[in-house]
Structure formats: C-alpha cells, structure tokens
Amino acid sequence: MSKRAFNFCAGPAALPEAVLLRAQAELLDWHGKGLSVMEMSHRSDEFVSIANKAEQDLRDLLSIPSNYKVLFLQGGASQQFAQIALNLLPENGKADYIDTGIWSQKAIDEASRYGTINVAASAKAYDYFAIPGQNEWTLSRDAAYVHYAPNETIGGLEFNWIPETGDVPLVADMSSDILSRPVDISRFGMIYAGAQKNIGPSGVVVVIIREDLLGRARTLCPTMLDYKVAADNGSMYNTPPTLAWYLSGLVFEWLKEQGGVEAIGKLNDIKQRTLYDFIDASGLYSNPINTPDRSWMNVPFRLADDRLDKPFLAGADANGLLNLKGHRSVGGMRASIYNAVDINAVNALVAYMKDFEKEHG
C-alpha cells in the first residue's frame, strides 16, 4: 500500500487508519458469517448487535444519562435544521437561536419557516471573529428551546463554555466537535451531529435527546422526521444507513482504545496549540479569531499575500498535505484537525509551513 496522505478535509474527514484496515478485513466476511455488513438485513441479529454495541460505546464515551435516547438517523445535520423545529417548536411558538457563523445562519433560516425565531445574540457585531458573552444575549422568557452551534467549521469559532438557559432546553449542533473533549450531556436537551467529521463516514446523523422532549412533534410532521417514532423503533422505522452506522461503531471502539474522550481531548489540545502557536509567531500566516474563541477542530489561516495561495496549496499537495483550501465563502486556508488527524499530521503541516515561509516570507 502506498503511503497515506495527511487529510485536513473539513468533511467528509479523515478516518482512523486502524478503523479503515479493520473495515477492509471485514468487508467480504464479517465475523465468519460469509457476508458483508453491506449485505446484512438491518433486522438480523448480527446487525442489531452491531447497532446496540455502537450505541452503548457512544453512551460510555460521553457518559450519556439513562434518560436520553440515542438515535442514528438519516438526512445529515442539515435535515435537523427543519426536524428540530417540527418536533420542538409549537405552532405559533418561538425559539431562540445564537448566530456565530454560516451553519448557525442556515439553522436560523430553516427554522424560520416554522415559527418565530429570535436571534438572541450574533457574532456579526464582532465580524464573526469573536463569540458574544452571555451577558450580551437577549433570551426570550417563552422560548421553546435555545439553539447554538458550539463550533463553526468555516469561520473557526468555538465555544469553550456551555450556555446557561435555565429550564429552557438547550439544543446544540455538535457536528464538528462531538467527542473532541469531555462535555456534560445533562446540560443539554438535545445534541445532534452529522457523522462525517468526528464520528464516521457521511450518511448518518447522531441525535442525543432527553426523553421528555419526545412526543412533541407537530401534527403535520412527517412520520420519518418524528423523533419519538425513531426512538420507539430503535432508529429503524425504515432501513437505516447500515454501513455508516457500522463504521461509526468502529470509530467508537477506536476512541475507547485511545483512552476515551478525556485522553483524546488532551491530544487535541496539544494539536491545536502546536498549530496556533506557530501561526501566531509567524510573519507570513495569521488567524483573526479572538484567542479564547478559537476552534480546536478547524483552524483557518491566511497568507500575508493571497497570490501565494496557489503555490502554497500546490506544494502542500505535493507533500501529501491535502484539503487545506479554505471554504469558498471566506477564502484563505483551513486545517481541520479532528480526532483522526494525529499530531504527526500537525507536525508535518507546521514543518511545511515553515519551509514555505523561508522561501516566500
């Protein structure tokens, strides 16, 4: 096998090599059954055991309380923007949303189709380079829930604190930072996360929802989008994305082998400090985000002269450092350093950036 590149893609993102090798070994013959997971009935004892183990491993990793349901659904996080409102926002109801970037805005725009949305705070006041402190928020007394995105993959903003919302359920889009460090699940009413960043391949979205929030769907909510229907049917009201579910389970096993979320969080801290410290000390590269609000998972940076962008990316590709181009809406560069991107990848990136600066700085 040729040497694997270092993949800094924002999503679908790098997967642990050990997971890929195990999936490869099991591809044609899962545990001596003579068939692939892709060929199994989702109702079979074999796949049900895969699904149950994946859920239990995720519960163990995040210490999910027993009064929360864990769902493995379809449609990605973007479908959740509507699904949340259809399940949790009553007719003529109101919800509070926090705007910290493009993904927050997409959630706001979609939810606005179903009810009144109060944008309780916006990072626009800081040009999306900082997160407004909660003392700046204007929360509604009668909100059905408060929604926010703890990490914005495009702008590179991340909360290092959990908002206080009292008795109002807190809903979080953790697509890009779930499992990256410990988090108190009991502080949330609901968490959702598209898999293709820190969980597994694209095709499945994980929903962690407190049981008292089930059974609130609107009358016209499609059956397939009703969280209670999904929970009552073990996420198998219809045929689920079995391969993505299985691969996500392998990632959970791998995370446990690394020492769990606490251990991976310490490694992620080292990774992000290594990269940000170099950028801050550099004369060629810069990151505009307020230091306490910098993302651990997605590190955007710019070169002092954007005419150097193309040669920088070409050289990176030649050195096996892939997918560093920033999102089209903001430009520049972006290194996504999720759990599966280890310190060797970050060190290789920093070494290349140093060499490029010596040549072009």
Swiss-Prot record:
NCBIfam families: PRK05355.1, serC_1. It is an enzyme of class 2 (transferase). Keywords: Amino-acid biosynthesis, Aminotransferase, Cytoplasm, Pyridoxal phosphate, Pyridoxine biosynthesis, Serine biosynthesis, Transferase. It catalyses: O-phospho-L-serine + 2-oxoglutarate = 3-phosphooxypyruvate + L-glutamate; 4-(phosphooxy)-L-threonine + 2-oxoglutarate = (R)-3-hydroxy-2-oxo-4-phosphooxybutanoate + L-glutamate. Homodimer. This is Phosphoserine aminotransferase. It holds the Pfam family Aminotran_5. Catalyzes the reversible conversion of 3-phosphohydroxypyruvate to phosphoserine and of 3-hydroxy-2-oxo-4-phosphonooxybutanoate to phosphohydroxythreonine. Belongs to the class-V pyridoxal-phosphate-dependent aminotransferase family. SerC subfamily. GO terms for biological process: L-serine biosynthetic process; pyridoxine biosynthetic process. Gene3D superfamilies: Aspartate Aminotransferase, domain 1, Type I PLP-dependent aspartate aminotransferase-like (Major domain). L-glutamate binds at R43. It is found in: Cytoplasm. GO terms for molecular function: O-phospho-L-serine:2-oxoglutarate aminotransferase activity; pyridoxal phosphate binding. The modification N6-(pyridoxal phosphate)lysine is found at K197. Binds 1 pyridoxal phosphate per subunit.
